[in-house]
């Protein structure tokens, strides 16, 4: 297939998991949310799925996709902004685990691997999505890559959570492009990093002025379910506890 052509999108349904392939990319969805033991249904049920807020000012788990771009060794090695590389890696792993638990589609992409310019996604992050394909690009702007764009559109989501390295390049470019197309975008400030604090901060300012919503990994994750008595909270809680313990190790 010509590298500029986009392969047809096809869906494969497997027991309790759904994989949606879009060209070279794979969108990963976790098993369906299980109702907690002892939970009941109907009026007065102690556990329920988290509904959208009336104003829809806060984001819900069922209306978002997670896009992760260029979490590669060369980029990690050059992070010089406020959130250090170890925490960027941990926060990204945390976001993936939350996404899998809440059935949020994930699009994972790299730049320059097939060209021999960069190495693949770091194992700690790739290992959170076993068996998934990764969309490799030549463009620093993922939004200009037809396979990446097809994968994003295949999610059917209009609210995007985006993380990338570096903040000022491979995050900023697709963020401002997505905003210009009418998507809502949340940038995860502590799951990204720049070549300097100045570059990182300037890029955050640019994206916010363009309409992006700045957030952090834990705050954004809890926003997606909000109610500790929701079914979503029962699967998210162990992940949050794991994250807080891991955070202590690198603090």
Predicted regions and their residues:
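N-terminal secretory signal peptides
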Residues: 1-14, 22-31
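Internal catalytic-core helix/loop-beta-alpha segment
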Residues: 137-176, 180
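A short glycine-rich beta-strand->turn/loop micro-motif centered on a GG-aromatic cluster
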Residues: 161-164, 183-197
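Residue-level signal for short, function-critical loop segments
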Residues: 110-112, 166, 191
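Conserved, surface-exposed functional patches that form binding/active-site neighborhoods
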Residues: 173-183, 198-205
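Short gly/pro/ser/thr-enriched loop/turn and capping motifs at secondary-structure boundaries
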Residues: 141-142, 168-169, 192-197, 221-222
């Amino acid at each position: 297939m010509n590298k500029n052509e986009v392969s047809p999108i096809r869906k494969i349904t497997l027991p309790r998991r759904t994989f949606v392939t879009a060209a070279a990319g794979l969108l990963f969805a976790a098993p369906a949310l299980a109702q907690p033991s002892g939970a009941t249904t109907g009026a007065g049920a102690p556990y329920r799925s988290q509904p959208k807020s009336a104003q829809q000012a806060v984001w819900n788990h069922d209306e978002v996709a997670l896009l992760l771009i260029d979490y590669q060794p060369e980029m990690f090695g050059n992070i010089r902004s406020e959130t250090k590389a170890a925490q960027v890696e941990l926060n990204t792993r945390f976001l993936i685990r939350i996404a899998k638990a809440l059935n949020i589609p994930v699009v994972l992409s790299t730049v320059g691997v097939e060209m021999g310019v960069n190495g693949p996604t770091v194992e700690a992050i790739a290992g959170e999505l076993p068996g998934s394909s990764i969309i490799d690009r030549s463009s620093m702007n993922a939004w200009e890559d037809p396979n990446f764009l097809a994968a994003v559109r295949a999610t059917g989501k209009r609210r995007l959570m985006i993380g990338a390295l570096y903040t000022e390049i491979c995050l900023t470019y697709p963020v401002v492009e997505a905003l210009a197309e009418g998507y809502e975008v949340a940038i995860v400030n502590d799951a990204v990093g720049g070549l300097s604090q100045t570059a990182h901060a300037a890029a955050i300012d640019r994206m916010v002025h363009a309409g992006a919503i700045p957030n952090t990994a834990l705050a954004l994750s809890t926003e997606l379910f909000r109610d500790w008595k929701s079914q979503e909270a029962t699967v998210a809680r162990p992940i949050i506890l794991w994250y807080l313990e891991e955070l202590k190790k690198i603090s």
